[in-house]
Amino acid sequence: MIKAVLIDIEGTVSPISFVKEVLFPYSKERIEEFIKKNLDNPDIKRIIQDIKNIEGRDLTLEEVVNTLIRWIDQDKKITPLKEIQGYIWEEGFRSGRLKAPVYEDAYRKLKEWKEKNIPMYIYSSGSVKAQKLFFSHTEYGDLTGFFSGFFDTKTGNKKDPQSYLKIAEAVGLKPENILFLSDNPDEIRAAAEAGMKVIKISRPEDSPYIDNFPYRQVDSFDQITDL
């Protein structure tokens, strides 16, 4: 029996294009200015040190910026990058320059599950800070109240079954009582291996239907009617 739903963001409830065509360029254009402006912030100092540790050497400020830009270009899911992007996007969302698109079918279903008191959790490679920003500034208003919790890469890699076991433990449920929704086939496999129920969201514009994929696929949240 499904007692909770764990949900990915990018390509699942929101178009992949928003992240790649709006959010990534927005952060890339502002990274250098943001770091220089916030060098005295203890959190930014820690993030810069984390970047140096990952690169395994001391870096000049210019090299730190170039490293972050390289990671953006390579679509790296690295925690210090996600944290910096979270800060930059926060400024954008709070100023009204950014507004998060949510698929209409996803919004309808999230609203329905909320009304049915089905606990929902988010698991995304974007930082928890960025996730909350996203859902507090959507085209449908502030949706953060829909969710009982948020998880990011601090929990673990989304393609590692252990990450899903940790989330199940954190929410106090057995994996088999959780339904995981994602557009990413590797994440679906990992969650299934951990024992979760899974459905791949196969929107043509984001992550097309995969022939002979061993798990259920739908192209709209409207097709998920058994909760």
Curated annotation (Swiss-Prot):
Q: Which prosthetic group or cofactor does it need?
A: Mg(2+)
Q: Say which family it is in.
A: Belongs to the HAD-like hydrolase superfamily. MasA/MtnC family.
Annotated cofactor note: Binds 1 Mg(2+) ion per subunit.
State the superkingdom.
Bacteria
Q: Which reaction does it catalyse?
A: 5-methylsulfanyl-2,3-dioxopentyl phosphate + H2O = 1,2-dihydroxy-5-(methylsulfanyl)pent-1-en-3-one + phosphate
Q: What does this gene product do?
A: Bifunctional enzyme that catalyzes the enolization of 2,3-diketo-5-methylthiopentyl-1-phosphate (DK-MTP-1-P) into the intermediate 2-hydroxy-3-keto-5-methylthiopentenyl-1-phosphate (HK-MTPenyl-1-P), which is then dephosphorylated to form the acireductone 1,2-dihydroxy-3-keto-5-methylthiopentene (DHK-MTPene).
**Quaternary state and partners of this protein?**
Monomer.
User: GO MF terms on file?
Assistant: 2,3-diketo-5-methylthiopentyl-1-phosphate enolase activity; 2-hydroxy-3-keto-5-methylthiopentenyl-1-phosphate phosphatase activity; acireductone synthase activity; magnesium ion binding
* Recorded metabolic or biological pathway in which this protein acts: Amino-acid biosynthesis; L-methionine biosynthesis via salvage pathway; L-methionine from S-methyl-5-thio-alpha-D-ribose 1-phosphate: step 3/6; Amino-acid biosynthesis; L-methionine biosynthesis via salvage pathway; L-methionine from S-methyl-5-thio-alpha-D-ribose 1-phosphate: step 4/6
Q: Name one Pfam family in it.
A: Hydrolase
Output the InterPro entries linked to this UniProt entry: Enolase-ppase_E1, HAD-like_sf, HAD-SF_hydro_IA, HAD_sf
Q: HAMAP family attached here?
A: Salvage_MtnC (MF_01681)
EC number(s) recorded for this UniProt protein: 3.1.3.77
Keyword annotations of the record: Amino-acid biosynthesis, Hydrolase, Magnesium, Metal-binding, Methionine biosynthesis
From the UniProt record, give one GO term of the biological process aspect.
Answer: L-methionine salvage from methylthioadenosine
Q: What is this protein called?
A: Enolase-phosphatase E1
Organism encoding this protein? Persephonella marina (strain DSM 14350 / EX-H1)
